[in-house]
Amino acid sequence: MFDDQDLGFFANFLGIFIFILVIAYHFVMADPKFE
């Protein structure tokens, strides 16, 4: 089972990963070069 430190690290990593994924998706969808 996870302790608080592992859970906090995982939540932080997941949040950063989703943030980068959303930014990358926005750039790909907004840029007409990628089709």
Curated annotation (Swiss-Prot):
Keywords (A to Z) from UniProt: Endoplasmic reticulum, Membrane, Signal-anchor, Transmembrane, Transmembrane helix
GO CC annotation: endoplasmic reticulum membrane
Record keyword Cytoplasm present: no
Topological relation to the membrane, as annotated: Single-pass type III membrane protein
Cytoplasmic side: 30-35
Endoplasmic reticulum among keywords: yes
Side Lumenal, residues: 1-8
TM annotation in the entry: 9-29
Residue ranges that the Swiss-Prot or TrEMBL entry lists as coiled coil: none
InterPro entries assigned to the protein according to its UniProt record, in alphabetical order: Oligosaccaryltransferase, OST4_plant, Ost4p_sf
Pfam families: Ost4 (PF10215)
Record's subcellular location: Endoplasmic reticulum membrane
Domain of life of the organism encoding this protein: Eukaryota
SUPFAM superfamilies for the chain: Oligosaccharyltransferase subunit ost4p
Function according to Swiss-Prot or TrEMBL: Subunit of the oligosaccharyl transferase (OST) complex that catalyzes the initial transfer of a defined glycan (Glc(3)Man(9)GlcNAc(2) in eukaryotes) from the lipid carrier dolichol-pyrophosphate to an asparagine residue within an Asn-X-Ser/Thr consensus motif in nascent polypeptide chains, the first step in protein N-glycosylation. N-glycosylation occurs cotranslationally and the complex associates with the Sec61 complex at the channel-forming translocon complex that mediates protein translocation across the endoplasmic reticulum (ER). All subunits are required for a maximal enzyme activity.
Family membership: Belongs to the OST4 family.
Quaternary structure note: Component of the oligosaccharyltransferase (OST) complex.
Protein name from the UniProt record: Dolichyl-diphosphooligosaccharide--protein glycosyltransferase subunit 4C
Species of the source: Arabidopsis thaliana (Mouse-ear cress)
